[in-house]
Amino acid sequence: LLLCDLTSSFFEGLAEDNDLAERGYSRDHRADCKQVVLALVVTPDGFPLYHEVFAGNTNDATAFPTIVETMEKRFGKAQRVWVVDRGIASEKNIAYLKEHQQSYLVGTPRSQLTDFEAELCTRDWHKVRDAVEVKTIRRDGETYVLARSQQRRLKERAIRKRQLLGWHGDLKKLAARVAKGHLKDADKVIEQVGRLRERWPAASKFASVEVPRDDGGCATRVTWRYDRTKLKSALGRDGAYLLLSDQATWPPEQLWSTYMQLTRAEEAFRSMKSHLLLRPMWHQLSGRIQAHVFVCVLAYALWKALDHMLRHAG
């Protein structure tokens, strides 16, 4: 059983001579900095087996086949079960795992829930833990598990509320600037709306914004309207996520609990970024970046080994 996840780590400085340093999606919320992408494979106990440093503009899904191939080269071919989140689990990657006779347990895009809503409505919920329930569908040798968590629902609604308040507040400020004549160029107003959408993506997708202009190309006002139906549908899915696996003999409780073990990889990233000072990176050459990451992963592996020894020693 292999748990795989990716994260990013940013640079201080220009890193002009570093082939790995690129701008991309920043988990550190530092889009202003160049970064690298770090892949990590850990055991269910959180012990790191493999890591890889990719260029900072690498997409999670495109990196995954390289990870699988490298694991096979280093450790030989075996019947492995890969556990990855929905950012990695593209249709292409699932097909890749099937082609290479690898098993999988993956998160799926939330939009895929619509494909199963009618059938799921006829199924009963089964409690697997306090405030966690699941439903199961089996199709073509694969198992889909719909899980919903009260804790996750509260967290997602809090995030959405914060996004909606921020988006709405910034739109009101932009509309006020246009109304007072401080910002007249309609094209620049539309550009500002685009930047707000980038800043508040979880909220802006529910709104349509219009910027009427006069004959001279000046914006007359900024208006917006929310898609209440779309927002209500999203609220109904808060806390819900759909898992997919080819493990037909595993009960839904085992599938859910195994997927939750992905937190082991997330814990590793948190430890490396905080206690082990993975970020920010001050090195400017790619070789030194590779060495810096290696030392951080090695230190984390030693810490996990000591933790394991102490726990078993009582």
Predicted regions and their residues:
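Anion-binding and metal-coordination hotspots
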Residues: 1-314
